[in-house]
């Protein structure tokens, strides 16, 4: 079962995401102490992180950079900060995708599924071969 860490300070959004993803059989953990995101990350050992940008103490860009020091797992930013500069910063700081709030839970789910599939299920496959194709 895949583990997902939700770093979101809006309790309603965090609870909604957690309940929805649990219905898809994901193990979901929500950070409660925003001074201890890395401790929670080490404890949970997630396969994927959902990261808000505006957080107490340190923003999501900071935590993404800290996670990138120790892991290459997928990080999807989920934020209402929908201007292009925040999207560019999120990806440049190590994020893999960006979803703008408000969002459809089904869109979030398929993005998570695709990210997990590419990261973990296809990881053992050899690179694509084009030798059988003719021009």
At which residue positions do the language-model features occur?
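N-terminal/domain-start alpha-helical segments
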Residues: 1-122
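Short, basic/polar amphipathic helix motif occurring as a linker/hinge flanking DNA-binding modules
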Residues: 121-130
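Conserved small/polar residues in nucleotide/adenosyl-binding loops
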Residues: 131-135
